[in-house]
Amino acid sequence: MDLYNNKNSDTSKIKRDASVNDRIPDGLFLACPYCGAQMYNKQLGKYRVCAKCNYGFRLQAWERVELLTKNFEEMDSDIQMDHPEFPGYAEKLKRAQSQTELAESVLTGTADIEGEQVALGIMDSYFMMGSLGSMTGEKITRLFEYATAHTLPVVLFTASGGARMQEGIDSLMQMAKVSAAVAAHQEAKLLYLVVLTDPTTGGVTASFAMQGDVTLAEPHALVGFAGARVIESTIHEKLPKDFQRVETLLENGFVDQIVPRSELAQLIAKIVRLHTAEAE
């Protein structure tokens, strides 16, 4: 206390080291979007889950591949389209491609998951919010067509904000296009396994996200069609807290099982093996 009480003390000799950065780096601490718990970034671990509620933080497609398999062969990586003349659309696409190392909002290919060969699709919410564009629909359609031709099960991780508004009706048509490919795959008595991740909304929810033979989900993932605020403004009522969370969907029969991210690969392989044995 003498330092503060002594008016004659010389504090001018205390100098700040200019080489030291006293600013807290961005992203060092995070708040869980579901429970609000504050945590150190490294506490999330390799699976990127909240230690308190097990909510799975959003992953990029390539990050999820690393968690699922060591053997992945990408398909249609060079797919392109003539972009509609929507102001700024081409620039947004280029920026998203640079940030995610993807050509479109879905990564597709074949993979070995715990010894089981599957056709794998992973939507990426970091690519324009995982929006469903015409090339997204084309890639998913081709994935199902390939799987049908090669008698492979399809495993699709959904994550989307809905149809891509910049493409108008072309985007909306992808719902029907992918659904037709799903139907042909199921007609061949092949397995289609969906994993709902946060967020899965809009046209994706209204079509192929809800057409799987088995529907799994990550804890506390947001799944719905319209946003909660849109619904509330329409019906003029306050919605329940977990109205569009997968826990509510599970209670009402829309989801078969909620699975921690660390257990997904093993469970997917087990389901594929059971289906293969049944088919034989």
UniProtKB/Swiss-Prot annotation:
ZnF (C4-type) residues: 32-53
Enzyme class name: transferase
Catalytic activity: N(6)-carboxybiotinyl-L-lysyl-[protein] + acetyl-CoA = N(6)-biotinyl-L-lysyl-[protein] + malonyl-CoA
This enzyme's EC code(s): 2.1.3.15
Cofactor annotation: Zn(2+)
Cofactor comment: Binds 1 zinc ion per subunit.
Coiled-coil segments: none
InterPro entries named in the record: AcCoA_carboxyl_beta, Acetyl_CoA_COase_Trfase_b_su, ClpP/crotonase-like_dom_sf, COA_CT_N
GO cellular component: acetyl-CoA carboxylase complex
Keywords, comma-separated and alphabetical: ATP-binding, Cytoplasm, Fatty acid biosynthesis, Fatty acid metabolism, Lipid biosynthesis, Lipid metabolism, Metal-binding, Nucleotide-binding, Transferase, Zinc, Zinc-finger
Residue span, CoA carboxyltransferase N-terminal domain: 28-280
Record: residues binding Zn(2+): C32, C35, C50, C53
Gene Ontology biological process terms from the UniProt entry: fatty acid biosynthetic process; malonyl-CoA biosynthetic process
Pathway participation: Lipid metabolism; malonyl-CoA biosynthesis; malonyl-CoA from acetyl-CoA: step 1/1
Complex formation: Acetyl-CoA carboxylase is a heterohexamer composed of biotin carboxyl carrier protein (AccB), biotin carboxylase (AccC) and two subunits each of ACCase subunit alpha (AccA) and ACCase subunit beta (AccD).
Similarity field: Belongs to the AccD/PCCB family.
Protein known as: Acetyl-coenzyme A carboxylase carboxyl transferase subunit beta
Organism: Leuconostoc mesenteroides subsp. mesenteroides (strain ATCC 8293 / DSM 20343 / BCRC 11652 / CCM 1803 / JCM 6124 / NCDO 523 / NBRC 100496 / NCIMB 8023 / NCTC 12954 / NRRL B-1118 / 37Y)
